[in-house]
Amino acid sequence: MSIEKTYCGFIAIVGRPNVGKSTLLNKLLGQKISITSRKAQTTRHRIVGIHTEGPYQAIYVDTPGLHIEEKRAINRLMNKAASSSIGDVELVIFVVEGTRWTPDDEMVLNKLRDGKAPVILAVNKVDNVQEKADLLPHLQFLASQMSFLDIVPISAETGMNVDTIASIVRKHLPEATHHFPEDYITDRSQRFMASEIIREKLMRFLGAELPYSVTVEIERFVTNERGGYDINGLILVEREGQKKMVIGNKGAKIKTIGIEARKDMQEMFEAPVHLELWVKVKSGWADDERALRSLGYVDDL
């Protein structure tokens, strides 16, 4: 009886903030793992998404966007997380946006040139490029920057050519035993995923109003006698004015955030969820490395 060969490897998804890395990861996995929002810097942890298909297991590392800006402790730690992801993988997917090329893209490229892993260039949001005639010269410019394994124009939002990326990934997975059972889609705990869902809703419903000085701590996550979960989430902000913003007029904003977060949690955990949210002012947390460690920002560096 012949034993079927299995293939397994780690793939880093890298790029400057807000180019669509999290959306691409979610499409590759077929469901939502990494939070997506139109604000830059929404991914703060290295989330591992796992996709197993027959003998192939691809383990995706969703990095925070690499930044030139390193003034705040949180930005320094996010850059460290992103850079460390690049060093220990079989393959890198470098995501750029349409015909835009910025100093941040250049910085990511320089880090990739120093690395050993082959790089797929995913040119995202090509469906949004107004001047289609600009696309080909831009792709030629990108091709001249380094020796990419492949250059794939994609739309992570619609899923266009995402299967092409997945196919290239499968071809480059080394022969190895699978790291995770086939039904795993992430190595993160439910508690962690609950905090990410709440944070996504904060980003979505507060938009540009709220600065990045907001995070979520899950104070309680227990199963109840109804077979569901009781979850208490604490939203930390830096100033009293931000607290009022999160709560909204007569509590309307936090109520909406809670309702939408609960829906996503119930879908993800496949069980009823009772969710309660509080807002607390904890000034200076984004500048304090000790506070960031206690909130889990450096647990995987």
Curated annotation (Swiss-Prot):
KH type-2 domain span: 206-283
An example Gene Ontology biological process = ribosomal small subunit assembly
Q: Which Pfam families match?
A: KH_2 (PF07650), MMR_HSR1 (PF01926)
Keyword annotations for this protein?
Cell inner membrane, Cell membrane, Cytoplasm, GTP-binding, Membrane, Nucleotide-binding, Ribosome biogenesis, RNA-binding, rRNA-binding
Q: Where in the cell is it found?
A: Cytoplasm; Cell inner membrane
Residue intervals of the Era-type G domain = 7-175
Alphabetical list of InterPro entries matching this protein: G_ERA_dom, GTP-bd, GTPase_Era-like, KH_dom-like_a/b, KH_dom_type_2, KH_sf_prok-type, P-loop_NTPase, Small_GTP-bd
Show the segment(s) annotated as G5: 154-156
- Top-level division of the source organism's lineage: Bacteria
Drop me one GO molecular function for this one.
Answer: ribosomal small subunit binding
Note down the stretches annotated as region G3: 62-65
Q: Specify the protein's topology with respect to the membrane.
A: Peripheral membrane protein
Sequence segments annotated as region (G1): 15-22
Q: What GO CC annotations are associated with the protein?
A: cytosol; plasma membrane
G4: annotated span: 124-127
> Which positions does UniProt annotate for GTP binding?
15-22, 62-66, 124-127
Chain positions covered by the region annotation G2? 41-45
Sequence similarity: Belongs to the TRAFAC class TrmE-Era-EngA-EngB-Septin-like GTPase superfamily. Era GTPase family.
Q: NCBIfam families annotated for this entry?
A: era (TIGR00436), PRK00089.1 (NF000908), small_GTP (TIGR00231)
What is the role of the protein in this entry?
A: An essential GTPase that binds both GDP and GTP, with rapid nucleotide exchange. Plays a role in 16S rRNA processing and 30S ribosomal subunit biogenesis and possibly also in cell cycle regulation and energy metabolism.
The UniProt subunit note reads as follows: Monomer.
Q: Which HAMAP family match?
A: GTPase_Era
Quote the protein name from its UniProt record.
GTPase Era
Organism of derivation? Salmonella arizonae (strain ATCC BAA-731 / CDC346-86 / RSK2980)
> Source taxonomy lineage?
Bacteria, Pseudomonadati, Pseudomonadota, Gammaproteobacteria, Enterobacterales
Q: Which gene encodes it?
A: era
